[in-house]
A protein has these predicted regions:
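Active-site mouth loops of central-metabolism enzymes
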Residues: 28-41, 103-126, 177-179
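C-terminal cap of metal-dependent C-N hydrolases
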Residues: 310-312, 329-375
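His/Asp/Glu-enriched, well-ordered alpha-helical/loop segment
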Residues: 173, 244-246, 256-341
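Metal-associated gating/positioning segment near the N- to mid-region
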Residues: 7-74, 96, 162, 191-194
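Active-site core of metal-dependent hydrolases
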Residues: 142-256, 273, 278-280, 299-301, ...
Length: 376
């Protein structure tokens, strides 16, 4: 809705791939080794920054310690801290040697690991039940590898069907959601077979996987995280990763494959949402709306389709399609007032000076944290 003085009123945005506890570090170990007390404060600060940046809803995609997401969600809901509506995730659950296993031969202790390491269905069941006991909204499973960890590249698939089945049985009993780190084609198919409805990455997708995604498009969401691929190839040199190193790690191949796969998904009507794995040194927090620009530039979205992916689809992925994501009578007033027209220039959404006001259920910046800024 275009308003006076060239301002635009739009629904608040939704980040579909949120890691509040990623502390803008360059390695998984540097995230994991942040002491718990400082980590809680970090998450609270980042949650507030997301709201100020126009994100009134966020979907947790994994946290670095067992209860960080749950504690932050509960504090937001109780009015103790400002922040977006939040769905809390578990830590990443992984298998020995795969993405998230940061233990060392001489330090095999689980506390040293970024993810929770399991081997077999029984260990999976125990891990999932523990996170469900803590009160998470979703269980995160690392089905595929990742080029960030060269010993388990992105096109490999690590988890056994019986391990995934054990996890999803517990998830479904509690009425919660299973989400998957799934870069490989086989891991995407595995996620779909087991009823996982939120798939992160989906970089390598063959025709069979595309057909399966399309058949399940009424229940499935894909949040690809292409910002991290772009950043690793083009913006990580100051952190010791040159373009050639990133290419040797497999990022150029994955970038090319991801753009092809995600463009095909979009054309087939599969819901692709922004969520770029922000919270690393090369993808710092609160540049998240940059994903919308990438969607237009690389995936064939129109600017309006990009906006809808973070608003209309945002309400759907938050499981509140009749309350969020649209400006309409009867919906919650999660609103964003922007200086200018995002459809003409999506980049204004990541310029703090252009965010004039954020309202979460009619409360300006929640508790009037920053008030409503007026142009001089």
């Amino acid at each position: 809705h275009q308003g006076g003085a060239g301002a635009t009123l739009m629904p608040g945005m939704c980040e579909a791939h949120t890691h509040f506890s990623w502390n803008d570090a360059a390695t998984l170990a540097a995230i994991q080794t942040m002491p718990l007390e400082e980590h809680v404060l970090w998450c609270a600060k980042v949650a507030r920054r997301y709201l100020e940046a126009g994100f009134t809803s966020c979907v947790g995609a994994a946290c670095a310690k067992a209860r960080l997401d749950v504690v932050i969600r509960n504090a937001i809901n109780a009015g103790q801290i400002p922040g977006p509506r939040y769905l809390a995730a578990s830590q990443e659950i992984t298998v020995l040697g795969a993405l998230g296993d940061e233990t060392l031969p001489h330090l095999p202790f689980p506390e040293f690991s970024f993810g929770v390491n399991i081997s077999g269905a029984d260990e999976m069941r125990k891990a999932v039940r523990l996170f469900l006991k803590y009160g998470v909204d979703s269980i995160k499973l690392n089905l595929s590898g990742d080029n960030f960890t060269p010993q388990s590249p992105a096109d490999t698939t690590w988890m056994l069907d019986e391990e995934v089945a054990a996890a999803m049985r517990e998830v479904k009993i509690r009425g919660k959601r299973g989400v998957a780190h799934a870069r490989s084609s086989e891991s995407v198919k595995q996620a779909l077979r087991h009823g996982i409805d939120l798939i992160y990455h989906a970089s390598f997708v063959d025709n069979e996987a595309l057909d399966m995604l399309e058949a399940a498009k009424d229940r499935v969401f894909v949040a690809p995280g292409i910002a991290i691929l772009y950043a690793m190839l083009n913006e990580a040199e100051e952190f010791g990763i040159t373009k050639q190193m990133a290419t040797d790690m497999g990022y150029q191949i994955e970038w090319d494959a991801a753009l092809e796969s995600l463009s095909k998904m979009h054309k087939r009507g599969i819901r692709v949402l922004p969520g770029g794995d922000y919270g690393f040194a090369f993808t710092p927090h609160c540049q998240n709306s940059r994903d919308l620009e990438f969607f237009v530039k690389y995936l064939g979205f129109t600017p309006m389709e990009a906006i809808r992916s973070t608003t209309l689809y945002g309400g759907q992925i938050m499981m509140r399609p009749d309350e969020l994501g649209v400006i309409k009578d009867g919906y919650l007033a999660d609103l964003l007032l922007v200086d200018g027209d995002p459809l003409a220039n999506l980049a204004i959404l990541r310029d703090p000076k252009r965010i004039l006001a954020v309202m979460k259920n009619s409360r300006s910046r929640e508790f009037c944290v920053c008030g409503v800024k007026a142009n001089p």
